[in-house]
């Protein structure tokens, strides 16, 4: 992750939705991001959108794991 401003996004989910979303995050792949990204978009730190998407997905997954939602 490039050095940038960190933002906080409050999120309130019922437990079943949090569990299902954690599963979704676990099952998402770099290829999923590649298919959905804009191949022409780059960010101010010169990273391609696919790489920023993938990093964001992994960061959200780690935050879920920190509060006990880490599917195997």
Each predicted region: which residue ranges?
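Positively charged, low-complexity terminal tracts
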Residues: 1-15, 19-72
